[in-house]
Amino acid sequence: MPFLTAEVRKGAPMGNLKNANDYIRSILKKSEGILRELEEYARENNVPIVAPETARLLTVLGRLAKPGRILEIGTAIGYSAILLAQTLPPGGKIDTIERDEDMLSKAHENIRKAGIEDIVNIIAGDAGEVLPCLDKQYDMIFIDAAKGQYPEFLPECLRMLKPGGLLVSDNVLYKGMIAKEGPVARKKRTIVNRMREYLELLCNNPALDTSILPVGDGVAISYRRTET
């Protein structure tokens, strides 16, 4: 079963979690080099990238899992791909999918700047159309894309995720709205309902062991069992 604090489960205000994340950010080691540059660019240009505490979690997961091949759904400007590339063992590869042309251009530029063009393969296109065409097996899959499409991504991700692999999903608490009781703003209802559906699918899938962490905007970590 996923881990959720009692406060979150009851729909209490997320203020305590926000304060915790602020504290965590204050003590984390600051990024350097290209990652620091991209953080500043994202902040100045309002580009969404993973939160600092989520970035640290991804780094730890990558170091522990030692994935030979990673699939990322949602490249944006390439920040997470560059971050995860630093955790790969020798010979490791990353495939990353992005549909936005401006993001694709910036991602290619940043991947070149990071000197990892031979490691990171950027695939242009909508993930819903690209995923069924992929025939590789992955040790780790990271989803950070259109939140309302997570349920559609899941079957294809499970098809390609190796036994013993990790499926990491970002923004699964979506600004605290997923765990909040009461009415949801009309323009957010679809995303909230689809994300709740996605979490139910993760937590009730017999092939997965899933934990939901209140880190950043919420991260679900699902381990693909070696036997079911």
Residue ranges, per PLM feature:
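A short alpha-helical cap/connector motif
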Residues: 3-140, 147-168, 172-228
